[in-house]
A protein has these predicted regions:
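Sequence/structural signature of beta-propeller domains
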Residues: 1-165
């Protein structure tokens, strides 16, 4: 029991703190390698850099970070600085998708081939509220993303209005 007499079992407990080799972290995800090994991937929106490590077998296991400059990958259109990468997710083949808020687009990276295999501009068509908000240069766009079956992508728009597209 805690000082207030309430149980601590429903409280978040920090098990480990790990420094990330990025200036800031805007997105994280898990990626399964071909042999089943799990990797944690982190991105930030200050520079076009990705950081990852292979998950250790135990909570206290050693973490060896690796980093790569995404802007140097073949086919990447990301600027080296102020890349505006807001989210990262991985598909079942181990490819990594990066969501860029400004300009609104995604890049799908094949980590084995060290190249961008697809770059897609994100546009909301029409004249409705969402389309107008999405095209506003001062507005908010994609802040989170999830890959869905059938090659679909779900994008979370942060605010004004907050939506799932």
């Amino acid at each position: 029991m805690g000082k207030t007499g309430k149980s601590n079992k429903n409280r978040l407990q920090v098990r480990r703190v790990v420094d990330v080799p990025l200036r800031e972290v805007s997105g994280i995800c898990l990626r399964r390698g071909r042999n089943g090994q799990m990797f944690l991937i982190a991105v930030g929106d200050r520079v076009a850099k990705i950081a990852w490590f292979s998950q250790p077998r135990s909570d206290g296991g050693r973490i060896d970070w690796h980093t790569s400059n995404i802007a140097k990958l073949s086919g990447s259109m990301l600027p080296k600085r102020d890349s505006q990468i807001e989210a990262v997710c991985a598909d079942g083949l181990g490819r990594v998708l990066l969501l860029q808020e400004t300009p609104p687009r995604v890049e799908l990276i094949d980590p084995k081939a060290l190249k961008v295999v697809a770059s897609i501009d994100l546009a909301v068509e029409g004249r409705g509220e969402i389309a107008q908000a999405w095209s506003d240069p001062k507005g908010s766009r994609g802040e989170g993303a999830v890959l869905l079956p059938g090659g679909h992508l779900l994008v979370a728009k942060e605010k004004k209005p907050a939506t799932l597209n």
